A protein has these predicted regions:
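Structured, active/binding-site neighborhoods that engage oxygen-rich ligands
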Residues: 2-412
Length: 412
């Protein structure tokens, strides 16, 4: 995949789009630095030099994780952010391999390099990188959804390595840019940022690229479902015209917000979706009800069925890419969390299905992490991720759920 060029228009706007309008008083938010040149190519967090991690950041992380109460808002928020990354990192090992049911091979982060990008255990792909861009955009803009800022961060990821897993592995560059998002970014560059909402594709362009990155939205707006769903929709529309894509983001936000608020995954959320969730896309309403669309077996979204499988027709057409359609990804993610009883079992089940396993794994991780929480994620998995993120993903989860403790909500 080629890297983008002719980004001078982006450089001229960086000062505006990457600088918060005000100062957040809380000490934890002061670990953000938008003035460092290093920030632009690596991380939102302050680093004095390459390979150096802020002592303040490490101290804050130690305090917040040691004082976390299981099933608390913070525990669930951090769990969802890390879940996104863990599902992505583990799922990459089998990404684009032909789908397989009921065969468990991978039960941990793996050993040695693996997957199509030959990643080390714990390194993530576009799913997490773009999810971190979304988180950073909300944090730096203090809860205001700024579509151009988000698109700029996506470009910085692909061109400069911002938010990728390789800040301590110079042999790698950003990886995983999908065809639909690539088209949207090229369009944005060609138009010099005039329209942040893509016209690439059409209203049926509904890949899984916006649900895979959605974790930050329900964490940030768990207190206000309507605002959360609104931001979920618009963050999808920057790269996907598809109605099903944005509606699946709304559904995912609805589910994760309820879980962060302490509702039970099975009794309060999944078994009540048919009565409590509705949107303006009929097919997604059918999916939420765990039903089939008429007599079309290839539009069967009955994820509550113990024997639920992907559409046989779509599997036969391209088995390795099954799950790349947002409806397939969402339905299978719900099936996996509905038929397992722990975060670990949910992740193991989804990544071993193969297909688009990193993106479907990312969605499973967001849901399972929000329900079971950070404290119920295997510590050995967390430590593998920490080798590459140095605890910054968890920090984002904590910061996002407390963002409006300090900042007045400003969302279009």
């Amino acid at each position: 995949m080629k890297y983008f060029s002719s980004l001078s228009f982006l450089e001229s706007n960086l000062k505006y789009t990457l600088t918060p309008e005000g100062t957040i008083d809380s000490k934890i938010f002061k670990t953000i630095s938008s003035s460092s040149n290093y920030f632009r190519t690596v991380s939102i967090f302050d680093n004095e030099s390459k390979g150096t991690i802020s002592r303040d950041k490490k101290a804050i992380f130690s305090i917040l994780t040691n004082s976390l109460t299981p099933t608390s808002i913070e525990d669930k928020s951090i769990g969802s952010m890390l879940g996104m990354c863990i599902g992505d990192a583990m799922g990459h090992r089998f990404e684009f391999e032909p789908v397989v049911y009921d065969k468990i091979v991978l039960t941990d982060m793996g050993k040695g390099k693996g997957g199509q990008f030959e990643l080390e255990p714990g390194q993530w792909t576009d799913d997490t990188s773009m999810g971190l861009c979304l988180a950073d955009s909300l944090l730096v803009n203090e809860g205001y959804f700024h579509p151009r800022d988000l698109m700029h961060r996506f470009l910085l990821w692909w061109n400069n390595g911002y938010n990728n897993a390789f800040r301590f592995d110079e042999n790698k560059r950003s990886c995983g840019l999908g065809g639909n998002i690539s088209g949207s970014l090229y369009e944005y560059v060609e138009l010099k940022g005039q329209n942040p909402y893509t016209k690439y594709g059409d209203e049926n362009t509904s890949g899984n690229g916006s649900i895979m990155r959605n974790a930050a939205v329900p964490i940030c707006f768990y207190k206000d479902m309507n605002k959360g769903r609104n931001v979920a929709k618009w963050q999808s529309l920057v790269t996907h015209q598809g109605k099903e894509a944005y509606a699946c983001c709304e559904l995912l936000t609805f589910i994760v917000s309820k879980l962060i608020n302490g509702e039970d995954l099975f009794n309060d959320v999944l078994n009540k979706l048919d009565k409590e969730f509705t949107c303006d896309v009929d097919s997604v309403n059918t999916l939420a009800k765990s039903e089939q669309e008429g007599d079309n077996v290839n539009r069967n979204w009955n994820w509550k069925d113990d024997n639920f499988k992907y559409s046989e027709e779509r599997v036969n057409n391209n088995s390795g890419y099954i799950g790349s359609y947002c409806m397939d990804a969402m339905a299978m993610a719900l099936h996996v969390v509905y038929t397992t009883k722990s975060f670990k079992d949910a992740i193991i089940k989804v990544v071993n299905l193969r297909g688009d396993s990193d993106s479907v794994g990312s969605v499973v991780g967001q849901i399972a992490g929000a329900y079971y929480g950070f404290k119920n994620i295997p510590i050995e998995w967390i430590k593998v991720i920490e080798k590459w993120d140095h605890q910054e993903i968890a920090l984002r989860g904590y910061m996002l759920c407390h963002l409006f403790d300090d900042v007045k909500s400003r969302v279009n």
